[in-house]
Amino acid sequence: MAPATKARTKTNKRKGKAKAPAMTPYSSYGLIKGALISETLQVCQGWDLQGSKRANLNRVRSSNCIGAPTQAWLKQVCTTFSRRFEPTSRDRSLVLAANTAIGQQHWKPLLLWHMANSEPLFGDGLLWAWDVSSAGGDQVQSAQALEWLESTTSQGHHEVDGWSDNTRKRVASGLLKAGADFGLLQGKVKRRFTAYYLADEPLLYVLLECLASNRTTAAALADQRWLWFRLPEQELEHRLLLLHQSRLISYYRAGSVVELKLPADSTDALVQEVWS
């Protein structure tokens, strides 16, 4: 990693809080279709950022660059990608990362970040899994995921009531399978929590994303989305101190004063200037 060259400093009178986004209705589609980790990488690697989403996906369909075994599966992959990502705006850095060696090496956590931000059901499911793990649980089963999913109706997600029993079961299973695909869980029936570790490169990527979507640096560090990667705030700060000691970043905190110097000031810049 290149030495720190750009700075971001925030001084706050009180600790900032992560933004509470407006509630977005859950969709069963994404978790049923799956994470599509390798397929998404292949699509992103051939993506023309100057072209439209339609033109790019038409090219994927005509060339079958992902090696789909059937036209039906190819169509489903393209539809899922179209619903899940916006490559010319919020997910531009993911496309850029797919075309770098570092981005490919750490593809799973990068994709997890973008997918969970795009699909609130997946993001909330990861937070629920964190609650189970932090409460001392060492495994989780589909029945528990189904119980959690059904409980979300009391939190305002009444759309779940409209799903069939089979759809709810498929979503619950899909949530745990996605967790396993991304390395957070292991096993088939009884999914056990893994000793997950977010490497330095994707950690800095996620940090830049959190800084961009929160008003203060303190709020970025307290953002609950770090829990998708099993990184509570205290552990995150310890990781930042280690990066500071390695001179990969500059990190200073004294009460409400937080100062960060990072290798880049955005994820686009990180990928293009540091990873490339």
What residue ranges belong to the model's regions?
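Eukaryotic partner-binding/assembly regions in large regulatory complexes
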Residues: 2-131, 139-140
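Contiguous, well-ordered alpha-helical segments that form the cores/surfaces of helical PPI scaffolds
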Residues: 127-128, 147, 177
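Accessory, usually C-terminal, subdomains that scaffold auxiliary metal cofactors
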Residues: 186-267
